[in-house]
């Protein structure tokens, strides 16, 4: 293997992950009918609560490492012993500033990727939305806000455009 082959392999893999034409994409391209009133209200809340500060870019995240529990101590509330994974980026850097700092996940197709958080403790989008509001911005969302934010997150699911990878050496 050489660097060029590895890079080509990664590029090919990434092409299989493309999921364009989400309803959110269609809305951004000018289709005002692509999203419902609740979904648009969720998008407004997403911006109001500064979610896009971390969930930014085409993939709506995945570009930075952020601290979990800025406003409340998630790990104390969880009520279980800390694990190696709870250390976040600290595992690699050994820099105390990186303890509990994890990569911000991209939100594209987030409705398909449960469970949530680095430890899988949040089983549904409703749960993760409430938890993120509490631990990251210090807000207790009401049921309507949760419903609208979750509705918006569902608009980020795109149409799968890739192809399944096939192992030619696979014996049936």
Protein language model annotation of sequence segments:
Residues 1-33:
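Extracytoplasmic redox metalloprotein regions
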Residues 22-123, 127-130, 137-139, 164-172:
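Short glycine/threonine-rich turn/loop motifs
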Residues 57, 135, 155-159:
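Generic structural signal for alpha-helix termini and adjacent loop/cap motifs
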Residues 102-105, 146-150:
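Active-site lining segments that contact anionic ligands and/or coordinate catalytic metals
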Residues 148-172:
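A cross-kingdom marker for long, charged
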């Amino acid at each position: 293997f050489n660097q060029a082959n590895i890079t080509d392999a990664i590029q090919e893999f990434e092409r299989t992950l493309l999921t364009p034409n989400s309803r959110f994409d269609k809305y951004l391209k000018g289709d005002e009918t692509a999203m419902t009133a609740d979904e648009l209200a969720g998008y407004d809340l997403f911006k109001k609560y500064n979610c896009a500060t971390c969930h930014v870019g085409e993939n709506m995240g995945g570009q930075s490492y952020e601290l979990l529990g800025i406003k409340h101590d998630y790990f104390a509330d969880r009520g279980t012993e800390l694990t190696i994974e709870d250390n976040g980026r600290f595992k690699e850097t050994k820099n105390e500033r990186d303890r509990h700092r994890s990569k911000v996940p991209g939100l594209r197709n987030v409705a398909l990727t449960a469970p949530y958080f680095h430890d899988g403790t949040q089983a549904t989008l409703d749960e993760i939305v409430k938890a993120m509001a509490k631990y990251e911005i210090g807000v207790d969302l009401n049921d309507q806000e949760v419903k609208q934010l979750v509705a918006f997150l569902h608009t980020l699911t795109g149409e799968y455009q890739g192809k399944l990878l096939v192992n030619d050496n696979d014996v049936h």
